[in-house]
């Protein structure tokens, strides 16, 4: 019985080591810009999230359905009053690590991580998931085996 338990522990330890190495490799590849991060929605959740990734050294693709938001982002600006977001956008643009796409499918094709940060507005106490569904449909067209999709929508309080 102890031998079986020892073999199980050895196998579990090997798996843990493999996972840690894999995660370390992901971090390295993100910081090198090999694995791009697409942030869908550059509003109250998406703009600060994109800025955090940019400050960490990642290459980020910003996507927003609003042309005004995209134009601002291409100038290194945002309408979100969060500290350091504009600075991160400007630095990312200068270092060619931040780009803004008009085409959400192209952003999906060009990225490894897809972060969905679109609003889920309440209508009659019901969430409206139309924006999420639209983004998911676009991502699906450009999705590749192994890609990671994270749903982090902004929701109203209450």
Question: Which residues does each predicted region cover?
Answer:
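Redox-cofactor binding/interface segments in oxidoreductases and associated redox assembly factors
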Residues: 114-116, 151
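Rossmann-like NAD(P)(H) cofactor-binding subdomain of soluble oxidoreductases
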Residues: 121-158
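Gly/Ala-rich phosphate-binding loop of Rossmann-like dinucleotide-binding domains
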Residues: 50, 54-55
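Hydrophobic/small residue at the entry helix of a nucleotide-binding pocket
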Residues: 45
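Residues that form or flank phosphate/diphosphate-binding pockets in enzymes
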Residues: 48, 109, 158
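Conserved N-terminal Rossmann-fold NAD(P)-binding element of oxidoreductases
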Residues: 38-41
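Conserved N-terminal Rossmann-fold NAD(P) cofactor-binding segment
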Residues: 3-36, 59, 65-112, 120-126
């Amino acid at each position: 019985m102890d031998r079986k338990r020892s073999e199980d522990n050895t196998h579990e330890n090997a798996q843990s080591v493999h996972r840690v190495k894999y995660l370390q490799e992901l971090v390295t590849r993100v910081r090198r810009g090999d694995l791009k991060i697409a942030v869908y929605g550059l509003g109250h959740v998406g703009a600060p999230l994109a800025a955090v990734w940019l400050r960490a050294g990642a290459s980020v693709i910003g996507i927003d359905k609003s042309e005004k938001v995209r134009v601002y982002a291409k100038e290194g600006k945002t309408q979100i009053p969060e500290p350091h977001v504009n600075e991160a956008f400007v630095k990312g643009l200068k270092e060619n690590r931040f780009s803004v796409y008009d085409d959400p499918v192209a952003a999906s094709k060009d990225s490894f991580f897809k972060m969905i940060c679109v609003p889920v507005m309440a209508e009659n106490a019901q969430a409206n998931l139309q924006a999420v569904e639209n983004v998911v449909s676009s991502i699906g067209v450009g999705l590749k085996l192994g890609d990671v999709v994270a749903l982090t929508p902004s929701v109203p309080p209450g």
